[in-house]
Amino acid sequence: MKRDMDTIRQILLTVRESEKAICGIDGIAPAVFFEHVRLLDEAGLVTAALQIVQNRTTAAIVWRLTWAGQDFADAITSDTLWQKAKDNVLKPTGSWTFDVLKEWLKTEISQGLPTLRGLGQ
């Protein structure tokens, strides 16, 4: 399975807004949700319970975002900034790392603090 950053974003923002554990999201196939939660757990962005059988994630429950997960969710909340990140980081090279994306988002946020407040959701 290939990592899909829109799916990652959707999971993080859903977990952040939820007051209860998440075991799936409408519009995301269960197998895709489970594997992306596993990636988020491995990256230290969520606290999750995973059921893994023969190296496949067969169930996942996300309890909460970690501190790092909260920070990343804050950075990707704005639809405008997220689209800009996709256009400038994710699409041009097709090859990137999570750390590159995080650093780009941090730079954009710090450079645009006065204007980002007006971007909305």
Model-derived regions: residue spans:
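Beta-hairpin "wing" of winged helix-turn-helix
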Residues: A48-Q51
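Short, amphipathic alpha-helical interaction segments positioned at domain boundaries
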Residues: T58-V89
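Basic amphipathic alpha-helical segments that dock to polyanions
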Residues: V32-V46
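Exposed, interaction-prone assembly regions rather than primary DNA-binding/catalytic cores
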Residues: S78-Q121
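Short amphipathic alpha-helical interface segments
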Residues: M1-I25
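Short loop/turn motifs at secondary-structure junctions and domain boundaries
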Residues: V53-R56
